[in-house]
Design a protein with these regions (language model features):
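Short, Lys/Arg-enriched N-terminal segments with co-localized hydrophobic residues
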Residues: 1-11
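A broadly tuned, weak detector of single residues within folded domains
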Residues: 4-6, 28, 144
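Short acidic, Pro/Gly- and aromatic-enriched capping/linker segments at domain boundaries
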Residues: 12-30, 42-44
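A generic hydrophobic-helix recognition signal that picks specific residues
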Residues: 27-28, 208, 221
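Feature captures the catalytic cores and cofactor-binding loops of soluble hydro-lyases/lyases
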Residues: 31, 38-41, 45-213, 226-275, ...
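Short acidic-glycine loop/turn motifs at beta-strand connectors
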Residues: 33, 220-221
Length: 313
């Protein structure tokens, strides 16, 4: 929520475009109508082929160590991924006086229905609601059959869904909604009650992770990673390098050409990189990785610390 002054009068707003822009200054590209970074769909599609660890590494080495949370249940246990642009919302327990304030703000902004409906009703294509329900499960069931159906119809995302630090209900109905994966904390038959919105498209905490509006949500491997919007392009490139190095590394280990210790080193030798380049150019399995820039890796191999024995992340 943002607080503004207008002609001496204090105005409070939910989902304020200027606040979203102020929270994400490192994003230099196109923005959505609400101010969130509009990460290109080609990167969302590229993430489908990557694993959690491949995507996590480029973020972690840059100091983003609070982007992952794994303490969830999933609506489906079939390995499907959740990928999209984050819409964040934060809630707190019911308090009568603040409830009046929050609802007055919502009415002034043309919002109708319950606090969770405010978010679902305004979703756009490829949006993923990221919801801090303060781990409330009993009477904290943010999604059920109806809202999950509405979510799917709004977002039109074959890898769509939601992340909820709270509860859900009607899971049998939810599972029938196509192309939808939901990460949640628990199930309860009670309808949602006694909660109030405190923030909409602002900084949101999900367990041990921090999510900003417009982050790319990557749910895979049993947990959720929030990728800062301005790093997505770099993350996709870095993850692709990890992917082809793994492909090559498994081959070399199987052929006894290198040991696991050599493959797992943080910095590869020039000899290993030369063989990797040859593998990329000649092996059809590596065709999609051709044309990538490996100058940084060669620089480390030639000028880096020869005693660096640290294993790769």
């Amino acid at each position: 929520m943002v607080v503004c002054t207008y002609k001496g009068e204090i105005k409070m707003h939910f989902n304020d475009r200027e606040e979203v822009i102020a929270l994400t200054p490192q994003w230099k590209g196109e923005r959505l109508p609400d101010g969130r970074p509009k990460v290109d769909e080609k990167y969302l599609k590229a993430l489908k082929t990557l694993t959690l660890e491949e995507v996590w590494k480029p973020i972690f080495v840059k100091g983003y160590e609070s982007q992952f949370e794994g303490r969830f249940h999933t609506l489906h246990d079939d390995g499907r991924k959740l990928i999209g642009r984050a819409v964040t919302a934060t809630y707190c327990p019911y308090r009568p006086d603040y409830d009046e304030v929050a609802k007055d703000i919502g009415r002034s902004e043309g919002r109708t229905g319950t606090y969770n409906q405010w978010v679902i009703d305004n979703l756009m294509e490829y949006d993923v609601p990221v919801i801090d329900m303060y781990d409330k499960i009993y009477k904290g069931t943010y999604l059920g059959g109806n809202l999950t159906t509405a979510l799917r119809n709004k977002t039109k995302n074959e890898n769509g869904g939601a992340v909820i630090w709270g509860g859900v209900r009607d899971t049998e109905q939810m599972k029938k909604v196509e192309d939808t994966q939901v990460y949640y904390r628990g199930i309860d038959p009670t309808p949602i009650r006694d909660f109030i919105m405190t923030g909409y498209n602002t900084v949101t905490r999900i367990g041990n992770a921090v999510c900003l509006p417009g982050d790319v949500v990557f749910g895979a491997g049993g947990g959720v990673l929030f990728i800062p919007s301005h790093l997505v392009e770099e993350v996709v490139g870095g993850a692709a390098k990890t992917q082809v190095k793994d492909l090559f590394g498994f081959e070399m280990i199987a052929q006894n050409k290198f040991t696991t210790a050599q493959i797992d080193k943080n910095t590869w030798s020039k000899e290993m990189l030369d063989l990797l380049m040859d593998f990329i150019e000649k092996d059809d399995r590596a065709a999609e990785y051709r044309g990538m820039d490996w100058s940084h890796e060669y620089d480390l191999a030639i000028n880096g610390d020869p005693n660096d024995t640290q294993s790769a992340l």
